[in-house]
């Protein structure tokens, strides 16, 4: 099934009639590193696919951010295309969104340099994610890792973004972006940047690790058994669910004091749409093995069409690249207009 090229999306809403409300703009970026997992799908991708017609959506594969940690060139290229295919396979539709690669729009690094000149060092020193990734060797990591919150802010502000879908653990980055925008606007006494708001995910946002249900499922977790990747085959899914942490009790019920079984039930609930009461009733006379078997079957059924579509998209790279090029062509005028406005305001050119 070929990818449908979007001929309807415009780079700016200037052609809207006076009676046509302009849609709010949503921006989201994700690095082409690691594997997209079930938490990404239930907490973000599925919801984006369901609500994409309501917004002016810009989805960016932030390959420049991926350079902050060591990665082989061919691995980066392959991961970028695979991620693009997975986005589309999960239901993103180019009639309602633009999907592009960050490095294909040169305004990103140029704006990042400008904004870095307006960002106090103290703001960057407070960013907890750098401290986490740098670990005990902060002097050996790249400057890019230290400064990447500025590039992230630039990604958002370039497109005059209204909303940024984020998890609760990314609140700090949104506040950082808002601080930069407000500081710049205040300094020059005009509304150069739209002040973005974070859309904090709720449904499916707290999918926890299978091996340690006290922490979130993460693509950066060194233990592959901690997560269900969207491209895991049925055998792998079965093994991971079979080894998922539970407890010594037998009652299948939602209980915050029993995070392991509650995590599996939460995943089952997100996949089936059933209420807690309906699920507990379904498994009232059954045990953990029955729940794990039912959950495995539901996961395999849910992910099979996504995996098939992903395979089809990667089998036709010219068409996939054309979609990414079109996305970049559509959004570049927005980024260029914002960058030019900034240059005019600060006296460049």
Describe every region a protein language model picked out.
Residues 36-44, 49, 58, 62, ...:
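Structured ligand/cofactor/substrate-binding pocket environments in proteins
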Residues 2-154, 311:
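N-terminal Rossmann-like or analogous alpha/beta NTP/dinucleotide-binding catalytic cores
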Residues 33, 74, 99, 106, ...:
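A broad, structure-centric signal for solvent-exposed, well-ordered loop/edge residues
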Residues 172, 178-349:
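Conserved nucleotide- and phosphate/pyrophosphate-binding catalytic cores
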């Amino acid at each position: 099934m070929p990818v449908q090229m979007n001929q309807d999306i415009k780079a700016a809403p200037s052609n809207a009639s006076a009676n046509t409300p302009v849609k709010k703009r949503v921006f989201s970026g994700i690095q082409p590193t690691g594997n997209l997992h079930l938490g990404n799908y239930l907490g973000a991708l599925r919801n984006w696919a369901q609500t994409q017609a309501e917004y002016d959506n810009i989805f960016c594969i932030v390959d420049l951010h991926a350079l902050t940690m060591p990665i082989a060139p061919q691995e980066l290229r392959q991961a970028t295309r695979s991620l693009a295919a997975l986005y589309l396979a999960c239901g993103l539709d180019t009639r309602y969104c633009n999907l592009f690669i960050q490095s294909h729009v040169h305004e990103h690094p140029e704006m990042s340099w400008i904004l870095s000149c307006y960002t106090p060092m103290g703001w960057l020193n407070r960013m907890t994610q750098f401290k986490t990734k740098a670990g005990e060797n902060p002097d050996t990591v790249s400057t890019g890792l230290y400064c990447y919150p500025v590039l992230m802010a630039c990604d958002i502000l370039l497109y005059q973004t209204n909303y940024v879908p984020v998890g609760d653990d990314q609140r700090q980055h949104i506040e950082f972006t808002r601080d930069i925008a407000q500081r710049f606007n205040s300094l020059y006494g005009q509304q150069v940047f739209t002040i973005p708001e974070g859309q904090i995910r709720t449904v499916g946002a707290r999918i926890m690790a299978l091996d340690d249900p006290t922490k979130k499922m993460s693509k950066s977790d060194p233990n592959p058994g901690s997560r269900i990747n969207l491209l895991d085959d049925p055998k792998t899914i079965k093994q991971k669910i079979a080894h998922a942490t539970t407890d010594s009790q037998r009652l299948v019920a939602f209980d915050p004091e029993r995070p392991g079984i509650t995590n599996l039930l939460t995943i089952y609930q997100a996949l089936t749409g059933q209420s807690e009461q309906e699920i507990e009733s379904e498994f009232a006379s059954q045990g953990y093995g029955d729940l794990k078997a039912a959950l495995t079957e539901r996961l395999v059924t849910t992910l099979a069409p996504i995996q098939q579509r992903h395979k089809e998209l990667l089998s036709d790279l010219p068409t996939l690249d054309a979609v990414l090029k079109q996305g970049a062509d559509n959004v570049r005028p927005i980024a260029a207009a914002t960058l030019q406005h900034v240059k005019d305001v600060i006296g460049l050119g």
